[in-house]
């Protein structure tokens, strides 16, 4: 399959690429609006012990957070917390090793795939703007890494499903939000593999004759649901904890480190 299938560099596929660009802008716009609402809501909290709640302005929370971080003074401790508690998630491994494997594989798989997709998207834009760059060469180089981290993400999702079905404590604590997140991630990953299988003819194509136009259509469908679920939906779901939890840990690093 030639590069036109992905990039829209040919006239036949240009609409598809433009659609993805428009959807990306819409998804990012929804995400930013959701984050605005969350940050404003967080600003309703107090700025200190025994103080009155803040006015909820958009700048209240960032100012308080920056002030608390600056007061710590120990940047080595902050860096240590950033690496161990946020990136490597050592707090979770102390609670459950299986839960940690689930979290770290989903986190690393998802974030790496997002970074690779963003890189490829930027290269496509540069190519369209006339820069002498070859998206096809980069795509082929990134192919094995995309496969690796896709399977890593799938592995984490399988663990999540296993825990929700067979681990009593996890099953009893499961709420609708959890089920939606797991189902959404599963659907996105599976459609991504199927889109790849249709394009390359591997076993993820399920041996079905999808037709000549199925590959770009399936890729576009996968892109749409990925943008809406993995970007636009974040501020309005439990996904917000991937942003809120690191901020909370950093803001309380000194107190929690001393426990």
Residue ranges and their predicted role:
Residues 2-259:
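Membrane-embedded alpha-helical bundles of multi-pass integral membrane proteins
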